[in-house]
A protein has these predicted regions:
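PLP-dependent class I/II
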Residues: 1-173
């Protein structure tokens, strides 16, 4: 069974090192060699700063990483509770990343009197301009009825952001 078992991870997700585009695989040598051939066609190598960061991440005490993972679990739980309080938003619980991806199409066609929300792009701009909360349209991810929000921030700031979001969404009729 070892031949069919492998682990794929990366610094961005495994160690919350956003921007460090370096991944790794633990697999049977035959599988690893095949992956190496494919990967070699996509990039010529990671820069030296990323390589050094990987060494530090992979050889340091893992306790802070485990604590960080628990903190992200707390944030995810709270974000899911906050999303459940927003009428019309539907969201599956994320399992790996520190983003949520709620479906927000129940707000399409609604207006605050000066602006009508036609799509997720409009809603993202509305949230940015009215609630001062940055989101990303789901269109970029093939889900035009969704938006993406990060929970890679303190619980205090997350609470403030969702309070603002809820407040401005209540103005849409």
């Amino acid at each position: 069974i070892f031949f069919f078992f492998f682990i794929v991870n990366g610094l961005s997700k495994g160690f919350a090192m956003t921007g460090y585009r370096l991944g790794y695989i633990a697999a049977h040598p035959t599988i690893a060699k095949a992956c190496e051939k494919i990967q070699g066609q996509f990039t010529s190598g990671a820069n030296s700063v990323t390589q050094r960061a990987a060494i530090v991440a992979l050889t340091s005490d893992m306790k802070p990483t485990f604590e960080m993972t628990k903190e992200f679990e707390r944030r995810r739980k709270r974000v899911m509770e906050l999303i459940a309080e927003i009428p019309g938003w539907k969201c599956s619980q994320p399992e790996g990343a520190f983003y949520v991806f709620p479906q927000v199409d129940s707000y399409f066609g609604k207006s605050d009197g000066s602006q009508t929300i036609e799509n997720a792009d409009d809603l993202c701009m509305y949230l940015l301009n009215s609630a001062h909360v940055s989101t990303v349209t789901g269109r970029a991810f093939g889900s035009p009825d969704c938006i993406r929000l990060s929970f890679a921030n303190s619980l205090e700031k997350i609470e403030i952001a969702y309070s603002r979001i809820k407040g401005v969404l209540e103005k849409l009729k």
